[in-house]
């Protein structure tokens, strides 16, 4: 159950990034994402690895905060976070269904009943998570009012 909570904490900021145009909301989503990822990783691996990763995340967040303060400080915050909450709730429900299921493995003519292997479940979750983050970044790049917009004259 604790793993499910950390996974929900990883997915919610990604959906916040999909709706967030304000750089400060993106900064908050990135901070939440990094904190949940480090807590989740610290529960599976060595806590020293999680500490080092958190320090790297905080360094990146500080660079982003300096960028926000100097370049784009006059954005208005978005009020459409209810859809993000709905998406995050749906993702948590989907994960809770897939985490507790068992699978059938067919070996030759015998059908053997085994439980889902935990590392495979983590690998599937991380690949889905990477896909969602990819869609969030693409959505930010396509949005015309986004910070990450690349102008054709600069390329």
Curated annotation (Swiss-Prot):
Annotated GO MF terms: NADH dehydrogenase (ubiquinone) activity
Predominant location: mitochondrion
Enzyme Commission code: 7.1.1.2
Listed transmembrane segments: 24-44, 51-71, 88-108, 118-138
Protein's cellular compartments: Mitochondrion membrane
Domain of life: Eukaryota
Key words, A-Z: Electron transport, Membrane, Mitochondrion, NAD, Respiratory chain, Translocase, Transmembrane, Transmembrane helix, Transport, Ubiquinone
Chemical reaction(s) catalysed: a ubiquinone + NADH + 5 H(+)(in) = a ubiquinol + NAD(+) + 4 H(+)(out)
One GO CC annotation: mitochondrial membrane
Presence of keyword Protease: no
Membrane topology qualifier: Multi-pass membrane protein
Entry keyword annotation includes Kinase: no
Family that this chain belongs to: Belongs to the complex I subunit 6 family.
Role description: Core subunit of the mitochondrial membrane respiratory chain NADH dehydrogenase (Complex I) that is believed to belong to the minimal assembly required for catalysis. Complex I functions in the transfer of electrons from NADH to the respiratory chain. The immediate electron acceptor for the enzyme is believed to be ubiquinone.
Protein's name according to its UniProt entry: NADH-ubiquinone oxidoreductase chain 6
Lineage of origin: Eukaryota, Metazoa, Spiralia, Lophotrochozoa, Mollusca
């Amino acid at each position: 159950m604790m793993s499910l909570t950390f996974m929900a904490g990883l997915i919610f900021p990604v959906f916040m990034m999909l709706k967030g145009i304000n750089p400060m909301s993106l900064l908050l989503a990135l901070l939440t994402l990094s904190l949940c990822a480090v807590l989740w990783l610290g529960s599976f691996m060595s806590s020293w690895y999680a500490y080092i990763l958190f320090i790297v995340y905080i360094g990146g967040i500080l660079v982003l905060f300096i960028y926000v303060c100097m370049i784009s400080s006059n954005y208005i915050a978005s009020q459409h976070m209810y859809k993000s909450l709905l998406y995050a709730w749906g993702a948590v429900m989907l994960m809770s269904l897939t985490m507790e299921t068992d699978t059938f493995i067919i070996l030759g003519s015998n059908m053997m009943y085994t439980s889902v292997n935990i590392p495979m479940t983590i690998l599937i979750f991380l690949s889905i998570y990477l896909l969602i983050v990819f869609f969030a970044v693409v959505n930010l790049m396509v949005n015309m009012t986004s910070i990450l917009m690349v102008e054709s004259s600069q390329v």
